[in-house]
Amino acid sequence: SWLYSNKKNNFVSKILNKINYGHDIYINSEEFGSPTNAKDLAELILSIIPKLNNEETEIYHFSNSGICSRFDFANEIINISNSKSQVYYNKLKSNKVERPKYSALDTNKISNDFKINIKHWKESLRDHLNQLN
């Protein structure tokens, strides 16, 4: 999953910075994952801590629900922001670090064990961007 917050230096803040200057976005990635709001993760952790049994430790995965490509993620940021910028797919290989092509997490265990409904990434992104404005 791809974690973002209101702090700088994450995918959302980088896209917002580019569109604030009127730049178009070029995405060369074929990566798929689940964009995840750090606020949702923090709220989840605080809500499940009292429910944990300290004698039995489990490993849980969490991300906002739904899966998208980085291209789709950038498009959604632009749409919610009502920007005139465009997203273009760039097939050129990046010089940056190789990333996994599929990094979505299975959240069924945490959802079932703690009886939680996980917010969809689009809804959470909209909440996040509205909070920034």
What are these regions (language model features)?
Residues 11-13, 38, 42, 70, ...:
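A general structural signal for well-ordered alpha-helical segments in protein cores
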Residues 19-23, 49-53, 81, 114, ...:
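A general structural signal marking secondary-structure boundaries and capping sites
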Residues 1-33, 38-47:
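NAD(P)-dependent short-chain dehydrogenase/reductase
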